[in-house]
């Protein structure tokens, strides 16, 4: 076989074998059955899908009532001081707010899917609102 000329190559710097730590060596020598059992973990996305199905089945309000009521009162302060609210009025506002947010997230998800993504981003919300005509 004919000899070929060797060209110089840059070394990639192979790693030298390191000494094992005492804990690693002890772990390897210990029997596998005597170890602590790992807690069960679902695959990524499984719990998310379960939560989606659960919340789509349910009809209860998802935002806590008192924090929402405080937010409504805080926003109302900017328009008129000493406003009073019937409890049914706050409930109606909360129903409408949650319905709006659910619809917005549905449209946002469609925008993310259109961009060949599964993760929603702020730009998806902005696009959904722009298409709806809520913000120019």
From Swiss-Prot:
UniProt modification remark: Acetylation is generally linked to gene activation. Acetylation on Lys-10 (H3K9ac) impairs methylation at Arg-9 (H3R8me2s). Acetylation on Lys-19 (H3K18ac) and Lys-24 (H3K24ac) favors methylation at Arg-18 (H3R17me). Acetylation at Lys-123 (H3K122ac) by EP300/p300 plays a central role in chromatin structure: localizes at the surface of the histone octamer and stimulates transcription, possibly by promoting nucleosome instability. Citrullination at Arg-9 (H3R8ci) and/or Arg-18 (H3R17ci) by PADI4 impairs methylation and represses transcription.
Location of N6-crotonyllysine modifications: 5, 10, 19, 24, 28, 57
Modified residues (Asymmetric dimethylarginine): 3, 18
Modified-residue entries (N6-lactoyllysine), positions: 10, 15, 19, 24, 28, 57, 80
Residue numbers carrying N6-methyllysine: 5, 10, 19, 24, 28, 37-38, 57, 65, 80, 123
Ubl conjugation listed as a keyword: yes
Record PTM ADP-ribosylserine, positions in chain: 11, 29
N6-(beta-hydroxybutyryl)lysine found at: 5, 10, 15, 19, 24, 28, 57, 80, 123
Sequence similarity: Belongs to the histone H3 family.
Protein name: Histone H3.2
Gene field: H3C15
């Amino acid at each position: 076989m004919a000899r070929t000329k060797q060209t110089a190559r840059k070394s990639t710097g192979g790693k030298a074998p390191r000494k094992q730590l005492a804990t690693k060596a002890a772990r390897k020598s210990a029997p596998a059955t005597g170890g602590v059992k790992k807690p069960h973990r679902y695959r990524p996305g499984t719990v998310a899908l379960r939560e989606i199905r659960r919340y789509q089945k349910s009809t209860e309000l998802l935002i806590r009532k008192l924090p929402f009521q405080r937010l409504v009162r805080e926003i109302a302060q900017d328009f008129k001081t000493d406003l009073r609210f019937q409890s049914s009025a706050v409930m109606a506002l909360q129903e409408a707010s949650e319905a709006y947010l659910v619809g917005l997230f549905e449209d946002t998800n469609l925008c993310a899917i259109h961009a060949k993504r599964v993760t929603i981003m702020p730009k998806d919300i902005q696009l959904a609102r722009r298409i709806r005509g809520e913000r120019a």
